Amino acid sequence: MKKTLSLLLLLTLILIPARAADVQDVKPTKNVILFISDGTSLATVSTARWLQWYSHPDKPNLNIDPYICGTVRTHSSNAPIGDSAPTTSCYVSGQPSQTGFVSTYPVNCGNDDIYPTDPNRAYQPTMTLLEAVKMFKGGSTGLVFTCEFPHATPADCSAHSYNRGKYEWIAPQMVHNNLDVVIGGGVSILSDDMEKYLKDNGYSVYRNDLKGMRADTNNKMWALYADREMSYDLDRNPDEQPSLEEMTKKAIEKLSKNDKGFFLMVEGSKVDWAAHANDPVGMATDFLAFDRAVGAALEFAKQNGETTVIVTADHGNSGISIGRESCKGYDKLTKDQLFKNLSQFKLTAEGFAKKVNTIPNSEVQSLFREQAGFELTKEELDALNNCKDYKFSPIPEAERHEKSQASMYSNSLSGLMSQIITSRTCMGFTTHGHTGEEVFLASYHPQGDRPMGMHTNIELNHYMCSLYGFEPSFLSDMSNKYFARHTDVFQDYTCEIIPAKEGEVAPTLIVKNKKDKKKQLTIHAFTNVVKAGKKADQDIILNSVVVYVDKNNTFYLPESLVDFLK
């Protein structure tokens, strides 16, 4: 018996080479791929796994399953329930922050702060791991996602703002931050000037051009799809938009050509969006699309031998549960009763909403028969016809009822579709917002140096830093060096802030050397280009972006810029 147990233990150790990774002992790898499934509670992962197993009996496991190694306590600097902006910011910068802050140091909130904060650093940009890999390792960097490109998670890796909604500040930073590969949504946000800058600097740029992206051989590429966010995977037209798996493979193909290594962040963006909508179909199917992308990265990592893959979520969302009060006899419910209806939906709530608004009212029932396996009830039809967003209602808009969502009436067509979907399942929800539980953590390291157990968001950042040989304090130290206040950097020179002109998104900083009038800097915010000389006719190209914060009327920029005035 002892010999049998010993043999089983030995086999376990051989099959699962893993140990709790002390930051000091982690063996660095040349490449890191960070996967973030936005707004994904553990029950979302379970739902996706069950749905896959029910639909494909030969696939009981997800790609992440052999690599699940713990959980992450993720939160804001001043609140246990996190917003997407500060949560991923902490993963990539090591600094917890607060709602809306994109890789930006938080404002001190006194006793509400979970960790101590320095009030003197409020609003300072915090350097990200992506920026550090590019600047100090010479590595390539990339972002893959299905939201629009300046949205919180991709922005967290490559831009800085105290307001995640300020796309006019965030988008130009991402364009000027020397990213090698960007694939995702947001065609309408990339201006002609931004596209020109990219092309002038050697990038291939594709807008809704799937064939172009597939054929591209340039190592520097932006490929964007849809005006804003891309479609849910279940709703996606494969002739128009690539899957997250294909985008991930394309990014790896390009980034891996750099012998100095790379950093890639891949986000399953719309798992979170479906969770906000309480749409279990969108949540589960988009997570499965995310898991397929993880599978592609794991395959590369195993063949490459120099790549770490980390998979997690930035926070929970919706309080989703498998089982709810209306499904009586929960412990007697069969897998058919729990998952058959869920498996029959061929569109997400958003997909149904869009489709319903393109067909006559008389064809609605046939749509649901074909795409969901049931017809709407009289109450559901009544709710649809009274929905403000429904274009083909026989009821004039002014005469439509305004009743609460609880009674199945909603001004949002997508929201109504979510209610209809959920009512056919045994999935439960507690909220349309984020939740504060720990999230799952999975990882692959070629030597088995994985973070085991429960880790904080800060510890996860330190682990990733160690993979590149960076000390835990490195990003904070570099934040002070490359995002210093202009008043400190140019304290011996004359500074004038020129208000933004019409069409400009931020003021301009003019810095003069009073003793030598030829030495002058013209500094525009949110770019990496500084103009030198009295006529501003010389370009200084930075390897970081300049950030302006209106809250304190301050430009944050590299300390070394002062050398051009001496």
Where in this protein do the model-derived segments appear?
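Positively charged n-region of N-terminal signal peptides that target proteins for export
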Residues: M1-T4
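Extracytoplasmic mature domains of secreted/periplasmic and thylakoid-lumen proteins
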Residues: Q95-L179, G186
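Structural beta-sheet core signal
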Residues: L34-F35, L143, V311
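Bacterial N-terminal signal peptides
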Residues: L8-I14
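A post-motif C-terminal structural segment
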Residues: T29-N31, T40-S46, W50-S93, Q98, ...
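Sec/Tat signal peptide C-region and signal peptidase I cleavage site
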Residues: I16-A20
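Active-site-adjacent structural elements in enzyme catalytic domains
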Residues: K27-G39, A43-T44, R49-Q52, R121-F136
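Cleaved targeting-peptide boundary
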Residues: A21-K27
